[in-house]
Regions:
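The feature marks the first
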Residues: 4-49
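Short, solvent-exposed interaction modules
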Residues: 66-120
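Acidic (E/D-rich), amphipathic helical modules within compact regulatory domains
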Residues: 34-77
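Amphipathic alpha-helical interaction segments
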Residues: 37-41, 57-64, 87, 105, ...
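Alpha-helical membrane-protein topology signature
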Residues: 4, 8-11, 27, 92-95, ...
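Preference for long, well-ordered alpha-helical segments
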Residues: 110-154
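Amphipathic, non-membrane alpha-helical segments in soluble helical-bundle scaffolds
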Residues: 5-13, 32, 36, 52-56, ...
Length: 154
């Protein structure tokens, strides 16, 4: 079905819908609005912690519609913001509409779906520039099967 009559936009809508359906499924819900909120919170919290070039490399892997969400409200002159896991949890919980105690699980589930759809290199590059404790909040140990250990993990 064509939503816009523009093939590339329709494909982006289809891909975004597929991502949101997968994310909703990871949470055991059909609520796409919830899936959108947690995805947006995940994208923005990660984006604000990344250097400009790393953010751009990661965003290039996203469907066009989600790339727009990623960049929405972004101020590249103010990144990377320096915050750790507790500030990440506050931001994510506020924007996703979840409790802080749910952030690790929620972020991990979104990361699992994102990892299925973007190149390992782009996601690994983004996670590797973060402090280890923050990276492990976003992608809990054991989730990134086959991902090489970071030097600060050895």
């Amino acid at each position: 079905m064509s939503f816009t009559g523009v093939r590339s936009l329709d494909q982006s809508i289809d891909k975004t819908n597929a991502w949101l359906a997968e994310i909703a499924g990871e949470f055991g819900t059909g609520d796409r609005q919830f899936a959108y909120r947690v995805t947006r919170a995940w994208l923005h919290a990660l984006r604000d912690r990344l250097p400009v070039q790393v953010a751009a490399n990661f965003a290039a892997q996203l469907p066009e519609l989600l790339r727009g969400v990623f960049y929405g409200g972004w101020n590249p002159s103010k990144v990377p913001a320096k915050f750790g896991p507790s500030e990440y949890a506050l931001r994510f919980a506020r924007d996703a509409g979840v409790r802080e105690t749910e952030v690790a699980r929620a972020a991990g589930l979104v990361t699992r779906v994102v990892r299925r759809h973007v190149s390992d290199g782009a996601l690994d590059e983004a996670l590797d520039v973060l402090p280890l404790d923050l990276s492990q909040l976003i992608e809990p140990a054991g989730e990134a099967i086959g991902r090489p250990a970071r030097a600060d993990q050895m």
